[in-house]
């Protein structure tokens, strides 16, 4: 694995373990340092949480799922664009996730989120833009899903869930924000931009 991918995985694991420990020792209030709470940030509070939330996770399964995504798709993006651009997409997608969450949830004092999902979704979208033949394997779907179909379908579902204000413990706002920014930044950085993805849609649709 490339050093940058390994470094990001280790950073996520390290911060997540620190968050698990904080929760065990000090409870939910002590763990707020590891949470992005838009209502607090809007009032100039808990800026540390906004940063650490990018790398902290709610549990081992949450951490493992995100790191599996980063491991599976990060290598392809880094190989195609180089370390600097890979890290830029990862960071920009995380920031995009924060901006969408903040815009939609800053007035909700009960809203909290954490995890690298926004950044990881950005990397997944980058992999699909760079190579539209990429397939996405999901645990609850028996066959791999073509990357562009997943991209379009997940985007539509996320918008529906956000508009419906569904509260299911998943930050659909963050996922969508990370995916959109990851896609946009990749289009700007990739040598062929959107051309491979558009050709895929022309061929099959």
Regions found by a protein language model. Give the residues of each.
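A detector for small-residue-rich transmembrane helices and their helix-helix packing motifs
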Residues: 1-205
């Amino acid at each position: 694995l490339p050093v940058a991918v390994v470094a990001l995985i280790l950073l996520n694991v390290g911060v997540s373990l620190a968050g698990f420990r904080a929760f065990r020792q000090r409870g939910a209030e002590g763990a707020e340092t590891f949470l992005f709470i838009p209502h607090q940030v809007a009032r100039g509070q808990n800026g540390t949480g906004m940063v650490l939330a990018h790398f902290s996770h709610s549990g081992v399964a949450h951490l493992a799922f995100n790191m599996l995504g980063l491991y599976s798709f990060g290598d392809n993006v880094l190989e195609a664009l180089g370390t600097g651009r890979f890290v830029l997409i990862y960071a920009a997608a995380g920031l995009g996730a924060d901006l969408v969450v903040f815009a939609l949830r800053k007035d909700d004092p009960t809203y909290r989120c954490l995890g690298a999902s926004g950044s990881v979704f950005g990397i997944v979208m980058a992999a699909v833009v760079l190579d539209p033949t990429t397939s996405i394997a999901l645990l609850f779907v028996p066959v791999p899903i073509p990357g562009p179909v997943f991209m379009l379908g997940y985007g539509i579902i996320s918008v529906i869930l956000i508009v419906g204000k569904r509260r299911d413990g998943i930050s659909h706002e963050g996922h969508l924000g990370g995916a959109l920014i990851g896609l946009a930044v990749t289009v700007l950085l990739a040598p062929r931009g959107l051309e491979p993805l558009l050709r895929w849609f022309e061929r099959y649709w």
